[in-house]
Amino acid sequence: AYRTKATPLSVSRLAAAESATRATAEAMNDPLLAAQWHLVNRGDQFCEGGLIKSVRDADVQCEGAWQRSTGNEQVIVAVLDEGVFVDHPDLKANIWVNEDEVWRSRDDNDGNGYAGDRHGYNFVKSSGVISWNDVNDSGHGSHVAGVISAVNNNGVGISSIAGGSGAGDGVKIMVCQIFSGNMGAS
C-alpha cells in the first residue's frame, strides 16, 4: 500500500532486471498493435486513410525495450491529466490500488490527507472518485494511461510501452486527475 512516509528503496540493476518481464513484438497478441506505428514501425503501415506511408523504424524502439523489459509491477507511474477509465479491460489489471482505501469512500483510511484515493485522486473535485466520462472530456487521460501501461499480450486492444507480459505485471498507473471537461486544478 502507498505510504506518504515511506523510506526510499535502493534497487540494484540486477534486482530490477530480475523482476522485469520480457517479450518481443511477435509475442504480443494485442489486435491493434499492427496500427501502433509509434511503438513498432516496419514501414508497411499507412496513415491518414492510406495516403501517407510510414517510415521504417520511425518509432520509440519498443521492440528493443521489450527485449529488456515489458514492465515491472513495482513501478508506479502517476498520470496527471483528465480522469482514467480504471475499469477498462485493457487497463484494469495495471491500475494502481491503494489497499487501505475504499472506492468512493469519504473517509481517509490511510491518513494521507486524500479520502477514498483507491486508484488516485481527483484534484478538480477534491475527491477519490475519478471521473473519465464527463461530456466535455476528450478521453486523453485514458489514452495516456493506455500508451504507458495497457495490458500487453491479453488479446485486447492495444499494446503499451510498459504493460507487462499479460499477467498483471506491468507498471501500475496512479490517476492524478487535474482536468475534467472545462475545469482544471492548480
Regions found by a protein language model. Give the residues of each.
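Protease zymogen maturation seam
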Residues: 1-76, 86-94, 122-127
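Subtilisin-like serine protease catalytic core
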Residues: 54, 59, 63-185
